[in-house]
Amino acid sequence: MNIQEPAREIRVIHETEVLVVGSGPGGLAAALGASRAGSQVTLLERFGCFGGNITAVGVEGFAWYRHEHTVDTEGVGIEFETRARDMGAAVKEPQSDSHAIDGEAFKWVADTLVEEAGITPMLHRLFVAPIMEGDTIKGVIVESKAGREAILAERIIDATGDADVAHRAGAITLKQAKEDMIGASVMFSMSGVNKTRFIEHVKSDPQTYRDWAYGQWTVETTGKEDEMFSPFLRKPFEKAREAGLIPEHLDTIAGTWGALYDSGDLTYLNLVHLLGYDGTDPDDLTRGEMEGRKQAMLAIEALKQCTPGCENAKLRNFGMTLGIRDTRKIDAAYNMTEADVRDQGRFEDSIGIFPEFIDGYGILILPTTGRYFQVPYRTLLPKGVKHLICAGRITGGDRVSHAATRNMMCCTVTGQGAGVAAALAAQQKRGFDELDMDDVQAELKRQDVRLQ
């Protein structure tokens, strides 16, 4: 059954040069890139904080791929990490040459970055529809406690993580069957852990990336990762299944821990993996949130009974929302390929680099040899909609390239590139496909982005 919604007038509450929809690593980087390129920028976010996966989900391992010989990206993404460290919102990450970002404290870091840049913040507003003139996007409709409102913009950046703007505006988007998507996760943290006893146990039985292959999982590596330390937890859950604490079929409960503080807080527990859930289906999201929390509590009980140092541990917090890794992607002017990310792809329209880090679909490759690929501008450009550009994990590419470009630091590369392009397109009154790449790359270099 359907109903007919009556036509109504919607108040225009704001006009801006560049509107960024979504404020995860890609959207926040896009807003900063556009602002630093001289444009008036508005950052729209459905939750009450900026930061996306870092803050709303609790993914604190921002650059856990980084090791001694990694050739890393440069630009706003590195700034997120250094500002968090300098503001007391990051600690040394246990498996890499990077910092784990405190997801709660980064809310304040993100606020600070937005305020310093003069960006107009709009929290607690949900994008619901594009405003179109033919095939040109002119703004968006949002819903909030204030009702239905309109925001107009000269250029719009889709950083929603699910290509919501592009999809509803009529751009071509692609989505795998949910059975083939990378699993979703409920992140959580514990308190009451005895740090000394826990670390002694970890050192007595160190785990490596080879141990990631278990149960329903198969993992492809290059071999060089197999002996490297990983803060991986599997054995407590095997013991718990044998003891009847965890149902036998839940052999997907396993994974990594993030930071362990002197206070006894053990954060960024990435132990719950939900397969067959579509992050664009609210019913799947509902089931995933509830099932994920149930599995997290089983995991905590298993750790309490089977891991030294966790005997008195308890739940500290869940992430605010389910962690989604894989939904819609745009069919872009250029779709990145497995060969691009595995074989050091090079592009004349590079907007930044990202190390050879592939994590997803049963593949784990860490960038320990100095190999990296360039990210092409064309992968940000959707087909079928003018004045719209995309950033984050929705950019164009195949499965294996997605396992690289979906990672948060790479999302900052596409975000900063999209932000600079949006600013220049608005200032020059040009389409995104009409920009001079020399101009885009010159501004990115001015913003300390490494292109080659």
What kind of region is each of these model predictions?
Residues N53, E143, G147-R155, A159-Q452:
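Flavin (FAD/FMN)-binding glycine-rich loop and adjacent Rossmann-like elements that form
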Residues M1-R11, Q452:
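Basic/polar N-terminal segments that are highly enriched at the extreme N-terminus
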Residues G27:
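N-terminal Rossmann-fold NAD(P) dinucleotide-binding loop
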Residues A7, I13-E15, G33, S39-Q40, ...:
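Conserved N-terminal/central alpha/beta ligand/cofactor-binding core
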Residues I10-G24:
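Beta1/beta-strand and adjacent pyrophosphate-binding region of the FAD-binding site
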Residues R125-R155:
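Aromatic/His-enriched, Gly/Pro-containing loop or helix-boundary segments
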